[in-house]
Amino acid sequence: MTILFLTMVISYFGCMKAAPMKEANVRGQGSLAYPGVRTHGTLESVNGPKAGSRGLTSLADTFEHVIEELLDEDQKVRPSEENNKDADLYTSRVMLSSQVPLEPPLLFLLEEYKNYLDAANMSMRVRRHSDPARRGELSVCDSISEWVTAADKKTAVDMSGGTVTVLEKVPVSKGQLKQYFYETKCNPMGYTKEGCRGIDKRHWNSQCRTTQSYVRALTMDSKKRIGWRFIRIDTSCVCTLTIKRGR
């Protein structure tokens, strides 16, 4: 299914070549621009403000259509809510590839590009003040995200609570591809390992904890049965609070 997603999106990317977006630049945490395009200027500097506006509209419509298609496919592979209430925890964090992916999952990139479009429609002054770095915004918990393989995970817990073996390679028509999982967890070397940032320690006990969600992966159970199952992987770092008593 992942290969189908990538094929579909690549076809959409080919349609974007006619859009007049040749250069773009956004202040903030790096260039959140159209994936795969280097950015060195502004849309206004290419063909004027009106041409830039037309380019943004064209690309926004195209990316919106891509996202809708991906969400439609995502709904098809999810199990019914009647069978499992945790189905809404499914995220597209799995990729089949012959080498380590160099970018976050596609939906993460599309979300970044949507944020870029929103920022591009702002005035320079509003854009500057909306930059989280300028406002002094910090995450409550420090986290890290990285691609891991089945060799790193080895086993996982499925939706029935059983332990399954995560297969490192998936057979395809032209050979085998490795399974990669995009995991997000609390940063053990971060500044929030002793507690959440911004919490009043006089009244609250706080702790940053890694939480998990379900993704679909090729696995083998204890009876040597191989199949696609939903397994738990690390997907976020959240802050948990307990009130201090006896004060």
From Swiss-Prot:
Residues with attached carbohydrate: N121
Signal peptide: 1-18
Domain of life: Eukaryota
Protein keywords: Cleavage on pair of basic residues, Disulfide bond, Glycoprotein, Growth factor, Secreted, Signal
Predominant subcellular localization, coarse grouping: secreted
Subcellular location: Secreted
Record-linked PROSITE patterns: NGF_1, NGF_2
Molecular function GO labels: growth factor activity; nerve growth factor receptor binding
Function field: Important signaling molecule that activates signaling cascades downstream of NTRK2. During development, promotes the survival and differentiation of selected neuronal populations of the peripheral and central nervous systems. Participates in axonal growth, pathfinding and in the modulation of dendritic growth and morphology. Major regulator of synaptic transmission and plasticity at adult synapses in many regions of the CNS.
Protein name: Neurotrophic factor BDNF precursor form
Source organism of this protein record: Helarctos malayanus
